[in-house]
Amino acid sequence: MTKKYVLALDQGTTSCRAILFDRDSNIVGVAQKEFTQHYPKPGWVEHDPEEIWSTQYGVIAELMARYNVNPEEIAAIGITNQRETTVVWDRNTGKPVYNAIVWQCRRTAGICDELKAKGLEEKVRYKTGLVIDAYFSGTKIKWILDNVEGAREKAERGELLFGTIDTWLVWKLTGGKVHVTDYSNASRTMIYNIRELKWDEELLAELGIPASMLPEVKPSSYVYGETDPNVFFGHAIPISGIAGDQQAALFGQTCFEPGMAKNTYGTGCFMLMNTGDKVYESKNGLLTTIAWGIDGKVEYALEGSIFIAGAVIQWLRDGLKLIESAADSEYFASKVPDTGGVYIVPAFAGLGAPYWDMRARGTIVGLTRGTNKYHLVRAALESMAYQTRDVLSAMEADSGIKLQALKVDGGAVANNLLMQFQADILGVPVERPVNIETTAMGAAYLAGLAVGFWADKQELVAKYKVSRRFEPTMDEQTREKLYKGWQRAVTRAREWEVEE
């Protein structure tokens, strides 16, 4: 039977999706289902790995049935996933020893403080490209080994396995035959040496993590194994692409050359710039991370994460009840020519790159008697664009590369007012692609390339279509005046929360 499709599995923080792409990179079908978020204590976030698997498997089955797809028509499967989220399971039974600890979970902040007190920050940054933070997998693994009864003993005996979500899904899809991850996901664990491309023995010893738990690290476009026919509707299909969600979006946006960048506007924002074979050590609060491994080489990226982006619009809707739906924000914001001098700094959970200020809190500044709800809605939207400029300035400073255009994706990019303001405040064009499912697209591309479904990256570049290009129209003087106002507003939000 002709191989017509590539199946992308997009395992996100709140939902599992299965998306089918054809040779022309068109979406043939989508199935999606949300799963449960567990909050056992304030600041703790967990997922049930078995529920993630059953939900992911369910959407695959739903997709095949709804669009009448024969598994034989699928050339390959690509996986993209929420990064850093940590699963530890028993090698023999296949059962998790604890819930998955999600990337947002802050329970290991104390372990991070201990590592910082030991003076390990420079070493961790040099080896892993990351800052010491509860966000990454390393301290989560340590927490499970230290706090789940019998876990450490089992791990020492070689009976436990660790994986990020990609690893867990491949293990399940192959019927427990393959324990693997890719370079991009490994680079988010805080225990992987991104220069030497191996698990770092010194950091493993520091955290007390046995090397026997760790998956083998492979390229992002590579045949890792095949689905177990008993699991996958009687068929053995190659699993041949893996990348963490943000790296997958960079690939899906065809940012294949150094200096190309994309920004994903979701709950938060994630901006990545391809830096080719260069490992830039950030002096400006960015992360250095592996973009992907393909064609026998590893390429790197600079990454800046903004904690609150689209979430500020949800807050206007649910917290303040200023709007009824997220789509209203563009209409309300367009009622006024500007914010009337109002700035909102949405530091609800501290500030991410380039500040990394956990004690910053949200502020609204510049209010006058003339301020109305339209000004507030507009200021909330503009905060996403200002934060993006903060990150871009840091990237340009670290890499010495001047951005030519910003490629964008994610839910909020449908907002034309936001995209135009983004182009204006950056002073560079903003490109919105026809297909905004770039994360799944990236996973599909990586998988398809590994099995020859697509010939090479050039073929993918030719398929990339821009739906709209927003050119900057603001003059330099206005742009800099507005941005200086934003910088002043940020200083008001910094270090607000005081330790009791």
Swiss-Prot record:
Recorded catalytic activity of this chain's protein: glycerol + ATP = sn-glycerol 3-phosphate + ADP + H(+)
Pathway: Polyol metabolism; glycerol degradation via glycerol kinase pathway; sn-glycerol 3-phosphate from glycerol: step 1/1
Residues noted as binding sn-glycerol 3-phosphate in the record, renumbered to the chain: T13, R83, E84, Y135, D245
One biological process term in Gene Ontology: glycerol catabolic process
GO CC annotations, alphabetized: cytosol
GO molecular function: ATP binding; glycerol kinase activity
Keywords from the UniProt entry: ATP-binding, Glycerol metabolism, Kinase, Nucleotide-binding, Transferase
Enzyme class at the top of the EC tree: transferase
EC number: 2.7.1.30
Residues binding ADP, per UniProt: T13, R17, T267, G310, G411, N415
The organism's place on the tree of life at top rank: Bacteria
Binding site for glycerol: R83, E84, Y135, D245, Q246
InterPro entries according to UniProt: ATPase_NBD, Carb_kinase_FGGY, Carb_kinase_FGGY_CS, FGGY_C, FGGY_N, Glycerol_kin
Regulation of its function: Activated by phosphorylation and inhibited by fructose 1,6-bisphosphate (FBP).
Binding, ATP: T13, T14, S15, T267, G310, Q314, G411
Function according to Swiss-Prot or TrEMBL: Key enzyme in the regulation of glycerol uptake and metabolism. Catalyzes the phosphorylation of glycerol to yield sn-glycerol 3-phosphate.
Family according to the record: Belongs to the FGGY kinase family.
Subunit structure: Homotetramer and homodimer (in equilibrium).
Protein name: Glycerol kinase
Protein source organism: Carboxydothermus hydrogenoformans (strain ATCC BAA-161 / DSM 6008 / Z-2901)
